[in-house]
Structure formats: C-alpha cells, structure tokens
C-alpha cells in the first residue's frame, strides 16, 4: 500500500511541479548529500528502521553536516559535537523555530504547547513558566513520594514473578510505571493499572504519540494534501485528537468542579488552571493552552523514562561486568545504610550508578534525532549555506559517538568514561545532549532524570537477571521502534532472581 501511495505522490507531484514550479532566483551552496531525484528528492532512499543509524551512515560518507531533499523541503542533518555547538549555542536564536508538520499543528491545539510551538513571544513566556513552576526543583521534589511509591509497586510485581521463576516484561513494567506516575503528577489521578480508565488513557496516549511521529505528504508536497485524506491519515489524526481532547476536557471539568476532592499534592493541571484563572501573560492563556501544555508533560513523561531504563537493562545484559559493578555499588551502599529500597536522595551517593545513567543516555539517547528545528534567516554553517525555512535535525545518537570527543570506541558501553571526564546532560556539553540544548532544550530535564533513576537503581538492588529460554546476549534485538522516543522494537523480557538483602 505504501509503495502505491509513493507512486501516486510521485506522479501527482511531477504533474503539479510543471504546473506550479517557479524559477529560483538564488543559488545556494548547500551541504553535501545524496543526489535527489526530480520532484520527490531523496524520498525513496530513506529508511524507516533505525533512522539515527541510517543518517550516521550518510554522515560517514558526506560529512558531519549533510543535506537531502524531500519534495519541496530542504533537510539538513548535523552529526558532530562541534557543529551541534554551532547550531545550538552560537546560532541558537536563528534555529529556534519549528518546521511545518500537520500532525504537530493539529494535535497540539495549533502549537499552543512548549515543545512544538513556533519561536514567538508566547513561547518564551510559556517556557519561562514551565522552568519556574512546572519543572522547578521544588515542583519535581513534591512528587518524589509518587515516583517512589510506584517504583515500590513495580518491585513488588517482579518479586512475585521471581517467586514463581516467571519471565517479566521489563518494557511493559516500565511503561506501566511511567503511565501511573504521569497520571498522578499531571492529573492527580491514581488509576487501577488494569482498570478501564487506565486502558483508555493508554489507548489515547498511543494514538497521540502515533500521530506526532507520522509523516504527512502535505508537509513535503504542498499540492498533494489530498493524499493524506486518501490514505486515511487525516481521518486517523482527527479521531486521535477527538479522543485526546475529550479526555483532557473531562479532567479540566473535574478540576473546575468546586465540590471536587483535591489531591494531597497539587497536580500540574491544577497549577495550569490556576494560571488560566490569573492570566499573567501578555498573550491570552486559554483552556486550549492548558490542554496543549499538559499534553507535553504526558507524552514526554511516559515515553522517555521507560525507554531509557529498558535500553539500560538491555546493555547491562550485554555487558555483565558493568552490571556486576553497578549492582555491587548499590548493594554495598544500601547494606551500610540498612535499607532495602533506593530513594531519590540515595542516588546522589552512588557515583558509578549516576555514571551508568549518563552512559545509558549517551549510548541510546531516547530521542536520538532531536525534535527538528527550522532556520529563520539565511545563514552559514561550516561554510555551507542554510536557507531560511530549512529543516535541521541534530542526530544526538551520532553526536554521542563522535570519536573526537569520546575516543576510538564510542560504541562500547562504559560508564567509567563519565568518571574520567566531567560531562553532564544540562545542555552545555555538546557531545552529550540527550535533552537537547539552548532555547529548545527540554524544560522537563530534571523530571525526566528523576523518573528513571529510582526504578533503574532498585532493579539493580533487588534482583539478578538472566535472559529467558537459553538466549545469549548476542541474540538480543537492538532495533528501535520509530516514533518520537525510540523504544526497543522488541520488548525486553528477563527472568528475575531475588537477592538476599542482608
């Protein structure tokens, strides 16, 4: 079906190209890249599977800055720490906009959110609000008990499976953990994990995430938007939005109900509705703005932490010496403390574990291709022209393997590199940018880190793991599932064994 659609796109685009093409008045010296076909550009050369590795392969051939074309759009990919710094620091303002994306526009209530909003005065106001209120250290700390409570529930499930020598699905457990935490933090709602409301929430979430990761023909072939309709993509987008909007509106209505029993800790939607009532911004802050911002929190919060822990455990299965070293540190510290559960406060006393978290985010950044930026004005990078309107991707996966920064073995999973070198993910070390950098850096970085540390550390404390059914580490599938966050394409399943906790 996809091949047929591509064929129709090509035919329709060729006809419309000759009807509407205008002569270019300016020639640019674009970065090198593969030769494009007429009209459709490099569309047929792209790969869906493991796009970060695919673009890294192109970078080896064409260099750390390359360009390609899809339809009417010029695309640029950055794959080195040096050029990432040029883009994200030196020329940050000029690359602070977002490119066209029909799904992003529709799902985010006309880009009223933080992540997908154009670079406008409203964006700057809403980002400042997010940094100072939604994601401040104080706000993140208020939900510490929620994250720890849900992590305990997750460990209890694994304990029961270990008693029966059953296989556990780490991917599924982590998604359940993040979904439960996010519902409590964002909405003040504690759902039964197997109940209908949680199933409804997950269905809505997956639909929204799916639309955000889709490619729309109309974004690249302006005269072929009808193909989004013919393929059913437009209808699917509207259906997902309808479910999403109905759910969030119900939560908003509950928040406004004066008879409602408020959660013990103010939820994020309570905070946002307070801002809606106060109207502190120069731009109007509507209910749709509330919905869009809460959507950012839900989508980012559920996806990234789960993917990170799964990738971490995957690499630990392939590097048993790292696993043993991490387990030894966590277990020795907790034995000395006399506790059987790692809290967020304990993590700061576990230097090797903190290095392990960083190495996990380095070797498999969960958003390996940072959310695309758009060039606002004509500029140059590395001597090449970058025209206004160009879409620019930073391949964080390739940047974190830049041999100039990480040495000759960047594919080796080695947490020690973060004990030997002072590098952090706060956006100022451009060889390590899992949360991005600059004006578009993820404002929820602190919350994202907190979401993954406690479950990750307690897996190391409480259990030994082995692969099921005689699998060997080399048998583990390392492919990624395409989307906003790159999950493993196949769930990670392990056999837990209880550890004697002194």
From Swiss-Prot:
Pfam families: p450. Its EC number is 1.14.14.43. It is an enzyme of class 1 (oxidoreductase). Keywords: Endoplasmic reticulum, Heme, Iron, Membrane, Metal-binding, Monooxygenase, Oxidoreductase, Transmembrane, Transmembrane helix. It is found in: Endoplasmic reticulum membrane. The chain crosses the membrane at residues 1-21. Disruption phenotype: Reduced levels of all aliphatic glucosinolates and increased levels of indole-derived glucosinolates in leaves. InterPro entries: Cyt_P450 (IPR001128), Cyt_P450_CS (IPR017972), Cyt_P450_E_grp-I (IPR002401), Cyt_P450_sf (IPR036396). Its cofactor is heme. Heme binds at residue 442. GO terms for molecular function: heme binding; iron ion binding; oxidoreductase activity, acting on paired donors, with incorporation or reduction of molecular oxygen, NAD(P)H as one donor, and incorporation of one atom of oxygen. The keyword Metal-binding applies. The keyword Nucleotide-binding does not apply. One of its GO terms (biological process) is glucosinolate biosynthetic process. It is a single-pass membrane protein. It comes from the Eukaryota. It catalyses: an (E)-omega-(methylsulfanyl)-alkanal oxime + glutathione + reduced [NADPH--hemoprotein reductase] + O2 = an S-[(1E)-1-(hydroxyimino)-omega-(methylsulfanyl)alkyl]-L-glutathione + oxidized [NADPH--hemoprotein reductase] + 2 H2O + H(+). Involved in the metabolism of aliphatic and aromatic oximes. Involved in the biosynthesis of both short-chain and long-chain aliphatic glucosinolates. Belongs to the cytochrome P450 family. This is Cytochrome P450 83A1. The lineage of its organism: Eukaryota, Viridiplantae, Streptophyta, Embryophyta, Tracheophyta.
């Amino acid at each position: 079906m996809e091949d047929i659609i591509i064929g129709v796109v090509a035919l329709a685009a060729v006809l419309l190209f000759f009807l509407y093409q205008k002569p270019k008045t300016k020639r640019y010296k674009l970065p090198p890249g593969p030769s494009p076909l007429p009209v459709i550009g490099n569309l047929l050369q792209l790969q869906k599977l493991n796009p970060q590795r695919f673009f890294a392969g192109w970078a080896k051939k064409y260099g750390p800055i390359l360009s390609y074309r899809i339809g009417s759009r010029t695309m640029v990919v950055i794959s080195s720490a040096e050029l990432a710094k040029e883009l994200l620091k030196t020329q940050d303002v000029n690359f602070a906009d977002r490119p066209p994306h029909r799904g992003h526009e529709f799902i985010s209530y006309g880009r009223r959110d933080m992540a997908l909003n154009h670079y406008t005065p409203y964006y700057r106001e809403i980002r400042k609000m997010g940094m100072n209120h939604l994601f401040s250290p104080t706000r993140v700390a208020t939900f510490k008990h929620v994250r720890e409570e849900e992590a305990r529930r997750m460990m209890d499930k694994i304990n029961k499976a270990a008693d029966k020598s059953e296989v556990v699905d780490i991917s599924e457990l982590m998604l359940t953990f993040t979904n439960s935490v996010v519902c409590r933090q964002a909405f003040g709602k504690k759902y039964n994990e197997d109940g209908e409301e949680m199933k409804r929430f997950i269905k809505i979430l997956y639909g929204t995430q799916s639309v955000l990761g889709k490619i729309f023909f109309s974004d690249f072939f302006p005269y072929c938007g009808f193909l989004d309709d013919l393929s059913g993509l437009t209808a699917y987008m509207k259906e997902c939005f309808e479910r999403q909007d109905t759910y969030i509106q119900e939560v908003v209505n509950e928040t406004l109900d004066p008879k409602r029993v408020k959660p013990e800790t103010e939820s994020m939607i309570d905070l946002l509705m307070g801002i809606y009532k106060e109207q502190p911004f120069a731009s109007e802050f509507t209910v749709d703005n509330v919905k869009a911002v809460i959507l950012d929190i839900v989508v980012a919060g559920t996806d990234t932490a789960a993917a990170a822990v799964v990738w971490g455990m995957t690499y630990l299965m392939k590097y048993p010496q790292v696993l043993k070293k991490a387990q030894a540190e966590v277990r020795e510290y907790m034995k000395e403390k006399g506790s059987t559960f790692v809290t967020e406060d304990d993590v700061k006393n576990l230097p090797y574990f903190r290095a392990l978290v960083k190495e996990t985010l380095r070797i498999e950044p969960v958003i390996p291709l940072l959310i695309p930026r758009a060039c606002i004005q004509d500029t140059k990078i590395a001597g090449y022209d970058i025209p206004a309107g160009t879409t620019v991707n930073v391949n964080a996966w390739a940047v974190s393997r830049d041999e100039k920064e990480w040495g000759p073995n960047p594919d080796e999973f080695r947490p020690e590199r973060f004990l030997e070198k002072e590098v952090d993910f706060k956006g100022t070390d451009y060889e390590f940018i899992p949360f991005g950098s600059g004006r578009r850096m993820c404002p929820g970085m602190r919350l994202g880190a907190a979401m993954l540390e406690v479950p990750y550390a307690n897996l190391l404390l409480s259990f030994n793991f082995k692969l099921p059914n005689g699998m060997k580490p080399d048998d583990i599938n390392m492919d990624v599932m395409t989307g906003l966050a790159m999950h493993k394409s196949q769930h990670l399943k392990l056999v837990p064994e209880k550890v004697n906790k002194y």
